[in-house]
Amino acid sequence: VTTRSSLEADLAARLDSATEARWMVEEVLGRRAAREHAVSDAVVEAVAAMADRRLAGEPLQYVLGTWAFRTLELTVDPRVLIPRPETEHVVEVALRQLRDTAPSRRDASGPIVADLGTGSGAIALSIAAEVDDVIVWATDADRDALAVAAQNRARVGATRPEVAERVRLRMGDWVDWFGALPATLEGGIDLVVTNPPYVSALEWIDLEPSLHQEPRSALVADDGSDGTPGFAAVEAVLRDGHGWLVPGGSVVVEIAEHQAHAARTLAGALGYRDVRVERDLAGRDRVFVGRR
């Protein structure tokens, strides 16, 4: 008889990772199954198929089909980028800016946030889950990615419907980053937050192979008008974003380390105030912040 314990042990040896083995078994069996719980042939086959995919080089998050991001468990598959710790830090910075900005609103409504290029919905849903009265407009230019965001909104909504109903999904495009938003929001957004494509086409070639399995359109951007590699999307958000923010509203953008100088320079020219770049957990310039 195959038990959960023996299945995990066999899988750990095959994957050379006890942690990944445990996660795969938990994904199929659930976390509450006892160590000596007898498992069916169907479970053994399902776990073996996951191991095959992992050994073929597929990212662990796609193999599992779910991944934790801050307080949420999200559906993740090859239609969207894998949520990363750097982006959790982006949310942390965004929440801090929102706490500082929102009290300046003249009306009694809660803060309004735009998450551009939402992908899995990780940023939008996290902000909605952690700020009680916020409305988050989440856009993406990729229909498949937006479908994953909708799945995750439903997933969160199954236990926290009040969170899901405050996230509005909109189909956008790569040319006009703000075009999917209702025109009535222009000049009225408290926070624009985004993890846009910021890898240049040349840089993409040299990325580790597993990153090539993630959607290229969510990673790769043209160079900026000043020649900064991969900067075009960040530049577009900064150029257009100023007019969409309320006075005192913030823009928070995940960037590549080498784009910090270009982002600061452009933001200064566009009239942003309190411009800074925060470092990620590895000490790299990663999160651009500015106020209207």
Locate predicted features.
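N-terminal auxiliary segments of SAM/dcSAM-dependent transferases
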Residues: 1-67
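Glycine-rich, flexible loop/turn motifs
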Residues: 35, 56-65, 72, 77, ...
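Short, low-complexity, intrinsically disordered N-terminal peptides in bacterial proteins
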Residues: 1-16, 42, 99-110, 158-166, ...
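S-adenosylmethionine
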Residues: 134-135, 139-292
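Short, solvent-exposed loop/helix junctions and linker helices
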Residues: 18, 41-44, 81-85, 227-231, ...
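Hydrophobic alpha-helical packing residues
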Residues: 11, 95, 127, 153-156, ...
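SAM-dependent Rossmann-like transferase core, predominantly class I methyltransferases
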Residues: 49-150, 171, 177-180, 289
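A general structural signal for well-ordered alpha-helical segments in protein cores
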Residues: 4, 8, 21, 47, ...
